[in-house]
UniProtKB/Swiss-Prot annotation:
Identification of the protein by name: tRNA uridine 5-carboxymethylaminomethyl modification enzyme MnmG
Known cofactor(s): FAD
Tree of life domain: Bacteria
Chain positions recorded as NAD(+) binding sites: 269-283
GO molecular function: flavin adenine dinucleotide binding
PROSITE patterns recorded: GIDA_1, GIDA_2
Binding site for FAD: 9-14, 121, 176, 366
NCBIfam families: mnmG_gidA
One Pfam family named in its UniProt record: GIDA_C_1st
Length: 617
């Protein structure tokens, strides 16, 4: 039989891609080396964080799975930056790393149109620059209309501890070389990247009296807009400590022993998740660095030491760990390591995540040069959607930079490329006030429903929410608060100045000191906290949001101006030589994308626009 889509690898990108295609009623095959290890968390036991938490919400709005699985597996939930503006708020959860893969496997096994196969892919079947399927290591072949590669850090991977180098994937699992070599031979530009993970410490060997406990928020909040949970359950603590002067001395005295500084590492590491060696070398003026001790699972006697990623030899790791407060007698359960792996140059991808080199071949996740579970899952979802749309003969779904962080991520990758593991940051999004944690469903739910990933019941609840929000906005504008004794006493109780004449709730809530509680006091209803949160943001930031929307709309004419793929840039007059070279290499799909290419200036864009208009005249 010929499948509609084959997904190679069942990490965070692979499972989202497979579920998306299957939900689109397409015959889908997901191949992975070990079905008990789908969507594992080989590094940090957490999901979410700045920008990343919003990506998880976006995945959920589009009909993906990560948010629901995270809610079911969380052991601590926290809203980051709650006192700051809504543009930078984001959820972060500690995840039970044993439970999360089980939850995801259960979803995969119960999804219609999805077949799971435990096995190893050796190479792709490619004919006439078009992928036709895959060759398995056992000699069998499987054919499909599309193939999505989501191999994570397993392509040509090597584990590095000190000067020891082992051919292996994360946690001693198998690496794969066949696909990596084949991609190179097919004309893909390969990158060599590096990431790392810290040691894991026995939970019962830590003296917690020397740490600062870090609890969750203690309030019910979820990643999913339609969460399968109704309470958070037992919440674990994380713990904060700092490195000691001894830690710094141990590192500087042994830098040559590190894989990173001993010349063993070839790959480029992540700028925003440096090793502890990197932190001390790059920031010599800092005497200490934060370390967070985080639980890995309710059922594991292991704690994750965030901030202590290293490639030092094991005996140096022992010294480093025992130099930390509360870790004087700590036992290392698993040692830290660095891992090198192959990735492709993401500028060889279209915005749909289909490759420019081989037709019907899509790539998603760390193979595209990103870091992080959330970035991988977002790409996997989009690759699955667009592979499905291609099978259905429809246009790809391309999320714009003012629509989603996922859109920012993909646009950055395919336009600017990367020479190091790419991490999504709030600062990368110029329209971040539009891309908030609270409004992911408003931005993206319609797309998920139209494609077939969001069911009727879920969409109906979303429609009711929009109606409720509209009703509450009208109530806030029409409900007048008069200076009665009761109202004046209430305002005094929340440290707000008195009113001297009637004022609407909408106008009153423009006061910075008044929050959601005031809305609930003056506009009581049966609606949930989410409605009140969005109402508060609408009232307080309406002017700013409208301004951001107008600025985004100005750029829309460039984003919607498509550029033919066969255009000869060298024939266009008055464009700089550098711009011609960059445009010819990257082949931007829209004028908007062309504006973001390094080396393409405003004059070049203007001349390109003149050329396109003359050609269409």
């Amino acid at each position: 039989m010929i499948y509609d889509g084959i997904i190679v690898g069942a990490g965070h990108a692979g499972v989202e891609a497979a579920l998306a295609m299957a939900k689109m009623k397409l015959n889908t095959l997901l191949i992975t080396g070990d079905l008990t290890k789908v969507a594992t968390l080989p590094c940090n036991p957490s999901i979410g964080g700045p920008a990343k938490g919003i990506v998880v919400r976006e995945i959920d709005a589009l009909g993906g799975q990560m948010a629901k699985s995270a809610d079911l597996s969380q052991i601590q939930m926290k809203m980051l930056n709650p006192s700051k503006g809504p543009a930078v708020r984001a959820l972060r959860a500690q995840i039970d790393k044993l439970k999360y893969p089980k939850v995801m496997l259960d979803v995969l096994q119960n999804t219609p149109n999805l077949t799971l196969l435990q096995g190893f892919v050796d190479t792709l079947i490619v004919e006439d620059n078009t992928v036709k399927g895959v060759n398995l290591e056992d000699g069998s072949q499987v054919f499909a209309q599309t193939v999505i590669i989501t191999t994570g850090t397993y392509l040509g991977s090597q584990i590095l501890i000190g000067h020891e180098k082992t051919s292996s994937g994360p946690n001693g699992e198998r690496t794969t070389r066949g696909i990596s070599n084949q991609l190179k031979n097919l004309g893909f530009e390969m990158l060599r990247l590096k990431t790392g993970t810290p040691p894991r410490i026995a939970r019962d060997s830590i003296d917690y009296s020397k740490t600062v406990p870090q609890p969750g928020d203690g309030v019910f909040q979820t990643f999913s807009h339609d969460s399968p949970i109704t309470d958070l359950g037992h919440q674990e603590f994380s713990y904060l400590i700092h490195t000691s002067p001894d830690t710094k001395d141990i590192i500087f005295n042994n830098l040559d022993a590190s894989a990173m500084y001993g010349g063993v590492v070839e790959g480029v590491g992540p700028r925003y998740c440096p090793s502890i060696e990197d932190k001390f070398v790059r920031f010599k003026d800092k005497d200490r660095h934060q370390i967070f001790i985080e639980p890995e699972s309710m059922d594991l006697n292991e704690m994750y030491i965030q901030g202590l990623s290293t490639s030092m030899p094991k005996h140096i790791q022992e010294q480093m760990v025992r130099s930390l407060p509360g870790m004087e007698n700590a036992r290392i359960v698993r040692y830290a390591y660095a891992i090198e792996y192959d990735a492709i140059n993401p500028r060889q991808l279209y915005q749909s995540l289909e490759t420019k080199v081989i037709h019907n071949l899509f790539c998603a996740g760390q193979i595209n040069g990103t870091s992080g579970y959330e970035e991988a899952a977002g790409q996997g979802l989009m690759a699955g959607i667009n592979a499905g749309l291609k099978v259905q003969g429809k246009k790809p779904l391309v999320l714009k930079r003012d629509e989603a962080y996922i859109g920012v991520l993909i646009d950055d990758l395919i336009t600017k490329g990367t020479s190091e593991p790419y991490r999504l940051l709030t600062s990368r999004a110029e329209h971040r006030l539009l891309l908030r944690n609270d409004n992911a469903d408003i931005r993206l739910r319609d797309y998920g429903y139209q494609i077939g990933l969001v069911d009727d019941a879920t969409y109906e609840r979303f429609e009711h929410k929009k109606i409720a929000l509209k009703e509450m906005i009208e109530r806030a504008k029409s409900t007048k608060i008069n200076p009665t004794e009761e109202n004046l006493n209430y305002l005094a109780s929340v440290n707000s100045s008195p009113i001297y004449e009637g004022v609407t709730v909408f106008k009153l809530l423009e006061r910075p000191e008044l929050k959601i509680e005031t809305l609930k006091h003056f506009l009581p209803s049966d609606y949930n906290h989410e409605i009140y949160e969005q109402l508060e943001i609408y009232i307080k930031y309406d002017g700013y949001i409208e301004k951001a929307r107008r600025e985004a709309d100005k750029l829309l004419r460039y984003e919607s101006r498509f550029i033919p793929n066969d255009i000869n840039y060298h024939s266009i007059h008055n464009i700089s030589a550098e711009a011609k070279e960059k445009l010819s290499k990257i082949k931007p799909e829209t004028l908007g994308q062309a504006t973001r290419i390094l080396g393409v200036g405003p004059t070049d864009v203007s001349m390109l626009l003149v050329y396109l208009e003359a050609k269409n005249a």
